[in-house]
């Protein structure tokens, strides 16, 4: 491809709203243009990269035995009402009405549609197992689209759905997809980690995310420094404290604490360590009730763990000060478990405390030297805190370390979550009707492009992993429009490279060499060849790998050997 026949839309300016390097570089390299908040046009250069990623995904899905189909983007409300997600999914579901006042939505995902297909088409166990996938545009009405295509409203996604007769078959399909995902992200040249994850709005009982490791990632990846354990911090289990709780030493005492509203203020006032106090958070229950969650003073609540607790509303909702005062009689800064008039759940670490401090459920007063069972019943105990770096790994091997990650894929074991609600069944070999066991598997194709840039760039621009590069070789002539020899040599080498099967971008513009070099570095083509009069005099071509700082001279006759 010659640049004169291509749409190379590089720019020097960085948009004011572009914070991440990937967003800045995708705009500057001419890959994207913004249409509206969270909506982007993929220009020819960007589309080539997007298609490269989609091709790898498609090849590995086919290799794993999945069958490609294409479902409608617009879905009827009736299917989502059947599954119970029409209201539960929230404001990210863009709802619309047609001219006949029938409800529809733009699909953020396709569990309902594929389950509807399955219940119509699958009748017997003999038709199983099956795995369908599509690569298609999705839409989620993000409350705050940002970071370019990293968190946009419209995006390209690969979503797959497996159907099996029993749980064993579902688990086998899950493992097959898990392995396919590892192959996909390995082939794309990404540094990634598969981690245990919460199932979120999709549902199901078991899930892994595939996280591309990057400092700008929105997710916290937790891993052991001595084992294979890895999880999203939302899912990371805190190891239960070891040993019995020691006996109390001091007598409970009520102290005046005017103006004290936080653990730090209490620690300063009473000269105690934050880890020797507890904090009490009030959340809403399933049926308009309130529930207290109690943690050690130096720990943070894990919202995802909390919203899965029995009796706690999903998604998690915190009570406001008015609700707290009406139920308990004090403000949020004076809460504690002693004589608390609502049910409470205690984190496992907080349950081990002895002689601890807490609010007295009375403004400007706290208790010190409180002990479980002696002064307050312990009640329900659960793991509800966020792990912290340095915690013992849940598998008992090593310590937990943290990294930042960008989620590019997730796999789920759904079981019969959708098939039961939508009555998708098949008849087994004994003639008994059974709900289909499902799995679902997503990859954010457009997000993967941005994540790759976050891992692969420098001050000059993008450094594409070869499988994702829009072109393999950049051919840059020096003063070609003044030198017949340079043009002739370029034409000959260009045709040889094309005939050898390489994707080449020949910069045939009438531009200064520095401009051409800068553009080729910016768009990230892995290999660059420079032909000049002085080089031809010596029978050489200058070769430079994009990821290298140094160029080298290669014999004109042996250029192709560089790439073999």
Swiss-Prot record:
**GN (gene name):** proS
Instruction: Quote the protein name from its UniProt record.
Output: Proline--tRNA ligase
> Which keywords does UniProt give here?
Aminoacyl-tRNA synthetase, ATP-binding, Cytoplasm, Ligase, Nucleotide-binding, Protein biosynthesis
In its keyword annotation, does this UniProt entry include RNA-binding? Answer: no
Subunit comment for this entry?
A: Homodimer.
The broad enzyme category this protein falls into is ligase
One Pfam family assigned to this protein is tRNA-synt_2b
Which SUPFAM superfamilies does the record match to this protein? Class II aaRS ABD-related, Class II aaRS and biotin synthetases, YbaK/ProRS associated domain
- Note on domains (UniProt): Consists of three domains: the N-terminal catalytic domain, the editing domain and the C-terminal anticodon-binding domain.
Q: Write out the similarity annotation.
A: Belongs to the class-II aminoacyl-tRNA synthetase family. ProS type 1 subfamily.
The compartments listed are: Cytoplasm
Matching PROSITE patterns: AA_TRNA_LIGASE_II
| Family matches, as HAMAP family | Pro_tRNA_synth_type1
User: What does the UniProt function comment say about this protein?
Assistant: Catalyzes the attachment of proline to tRNA(Pro) in a two-step reaction: proline is first activated by ATP to form Pro-AMP and then transferred to the acceptor end of tRNA(Pro). As ProRS can inadvertently accommodate and process non-cognate amino acids such as alanine and cysteine, to avoid such errors it has two additional distinct editing activities against alanine. One activity is designated as 'pretransfer' editing and involves the tRNA(Pro)-independent hydrolysis of activated Ala-AMP.
Give me the Gene Ontology terms describing cellular component: cytosol
InterPro entries for the chain? aa-tRNA-synt_IIb, aa-tRNA-synth_II, aa-tRNA-synth_II/BPL/LPL, Anticodon-bd, Anticodon-bd_dom_sf, Pro-tRNA-ligase_IIa, Pro-tRNA-synth_IIa_bac-type, Pro-tRNA-Synthase_IIa_type1
Organism, scientific name: Coxiella burnetii (strain Dugway 5J108-111)
Query: Catalytic activity, per the record?
Result: tRNA(Pro) + L-proline + ATP = L-prolyl-tRNA(Pro) + AMP + diphosphate
Q: What's the EC number here?
A: 6.1.1.15
State any GO BP term from the record: prolyl-tRNA aminoacylation
Q: Name one GO molecular function term.
A: ATP binding
CDD domains given in the database record: ProRS-INS (cd04334), ProRS_anticodon_short (cd00861), ProRS_core_prok (cd00779)
């Amino acid at each position: 491809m010659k640049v004169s026949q291509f749409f190379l839309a590089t720019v020097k300016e960085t948009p004011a709203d572009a914070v991440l390097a990937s967003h800045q570089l995708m705009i500057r390299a001419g890959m994207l243009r913004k249409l509206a908040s969270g909506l982007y046009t993929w220009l020819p250069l960007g589309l080539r990269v997007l298609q490269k990623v989609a091709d790898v995904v498609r090849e590995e899905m086919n290799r794993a035995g999945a069958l490609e189909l294409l479902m409608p983007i617009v879905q009827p409300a009736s299917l989502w009402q059947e599954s119970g997600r029409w209201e539960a999914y929230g404001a990210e579901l863009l709802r619309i009405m047609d001219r006949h006042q029938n409800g529809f939505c733009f699909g953020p995902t396709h569990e309902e549609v594929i389950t509807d297909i399955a219940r119509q088409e699958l009748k017997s166990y003999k038709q199983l197992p099956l795995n369908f996938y599509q690569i298609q545009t999705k839409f989620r009405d993000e409350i705050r689209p940002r970071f370019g295509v990293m968190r946009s409203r419209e995006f390209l996604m690969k979503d797959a759905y497996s159907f099996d007769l029993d749980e064993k078959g579902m688990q086998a399909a899950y493992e097959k997809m898990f392995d396919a995902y590892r192959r996909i992200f390995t082939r794309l040249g990404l540094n990634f980690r598969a981690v245990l994850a919460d199932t979120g709005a999709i549902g199901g009982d078991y899930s892994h995310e595939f996280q591309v490791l990057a400092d700008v990632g929105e997710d916290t990846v937790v891993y052991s420094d001595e084992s294979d354990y890895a999880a999203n911090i939302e899912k990371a289990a805190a190891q239960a404290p070891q040993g019995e709780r020691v006996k109390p030493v001091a007598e409970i005492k009520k102290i005046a604490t005017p103006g004290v509203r936080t653990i730090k203020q209490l620690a300063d006032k009473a000269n105690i360590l934050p880890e020797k106090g507890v904090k009490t958070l009030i959340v809403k229950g399933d049926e308009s009730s309130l529930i207290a969650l109690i943690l050690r003073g130096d720990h943070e609540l894990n919202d995802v763990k909390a919203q899965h607790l029995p009796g706690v509303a999903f998604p998690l909702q915190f009570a406001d000060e008015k609700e707290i005062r009406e139920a308990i009689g004090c403000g949020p800064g004076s809460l504690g478990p002693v004589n608390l008039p609502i049910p409470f759940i205690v984190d496992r670490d907080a349950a081990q405390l002895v002689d601890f401090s807490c609010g007295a459920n009375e403004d400007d007063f706290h208790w010190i030297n409180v002990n479980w069972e002696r002064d307050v019943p312990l009640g329900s105990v659960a793991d509800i805190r966020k792990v912290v770096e340095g915690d013992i790994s849940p598998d008992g091997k090593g310590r937990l370390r943290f990294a930042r990650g960008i989620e590019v894929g997730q796999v789920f074991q759904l079981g019969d979550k959708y098939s039961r609600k939508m009555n998708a069944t098949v008849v087994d070999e004994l003639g008994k009707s059974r709900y289909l066991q499902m799995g679902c598997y997503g990859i954010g194709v457009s997000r993967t492009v941005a994540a790759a840039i976050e891992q692969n760039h420098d001050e000059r621009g993008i450094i594409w992993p070869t499988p994702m590069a829009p072109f393999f070789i950049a051919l840059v002539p020096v003063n070609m429009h003044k030198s017949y020899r340079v043009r002739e040599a370029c034409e000959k080498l260009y045709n040889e490279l094309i005939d050898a099967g390489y994707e080449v971008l020949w910069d045939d513009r009438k531009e200064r060499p520095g401009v051409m070099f800068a553009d080729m570095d910016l768009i990230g083509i892995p290999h660059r060849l420079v032909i000049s009069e002085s080089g031809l005099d010596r029978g050489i071509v200058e070769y430079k790998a994009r990821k290298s700082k140094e160029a080298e001279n290669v014999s004109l006759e042996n250029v192709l050997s560089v790439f073999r």
